[in-house]
Amino acid sequence: MNFCPKCSSAEIVKKIPEGDNRERDVCNKCEEIFYSNPNIVTGVLAYTDNDEILLCKRSIEPRHGYWTLPAGFLENQESIEEGALRETEEEAKLQVSDVKLFTVLSVPHIDQIYTFFTGKVVNYDFGPTPESSEVKLFKYDEIPWSELAFPSVIKTIKLFLEHGDDKIFNEVLRPKV
């Protein structure tokens, strides 16, 4: 942060504000405190009655060329479900029904929170988009595990295959040391 959005001062310093316990960006002129919060990623695990899930091959970084569930960053003024459905349309041209919250995954080492919903594939007119070079249904036993982009996607798919979507999972993912 270079300038205070409240008073336009360039006097932004890092310090622990009175009554707080974490270092924050603070304007030295007007004393405005600026909080940096985790980003929320939201998406959909889309499935069919034929034991298939939909995956998108990423055509953008990070993890270009790897498979993922359609997902992306939540925008201001949208609910996590609205964001998940928007991202699913943007990345796969897909609509889903019977949408249910499925996983909430905290990933503290990268300051992100992932929320995945499950949803039943409604239209089979899905296809590639600027963000996905390929969009494909995979039988459960044909999922390309070694080509999946992110631990959050792997965890969500494994939980779905083990438990179906009758339960909500709330877990923390940490890097292996």
Predicted regions and their residues:
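Acidic, metal-coordinating catalytic segment for phosphate/diphosphate chemistry
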Residues: 1-44
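Long, charge-rich boundary regions
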Residues: 31-101
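Unchanged
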Residues: 48, 74-159, 167-169
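A short beta-turn/loop motif at secondary-structure boundaries
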Residues: 19, 61, 105-109, 176-177
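Charged phosphate-binding loop/patch that engages nucleotide di/tri-phosphates or the phosphate backbone
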Residues: 163-177
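Short amphipathic beta-strand/extended segments with alternating polar/hydrophobic composition
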Residues: 35-36, 139, 172-173
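A generic structural signal for beta-strand entry/edge sites
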Residues: 22-24, 52, 64, 112
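Short glycine-/acidic-enriched loop or helix-start segments at secondary-structure transitions
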Residues: 16, 65, 147
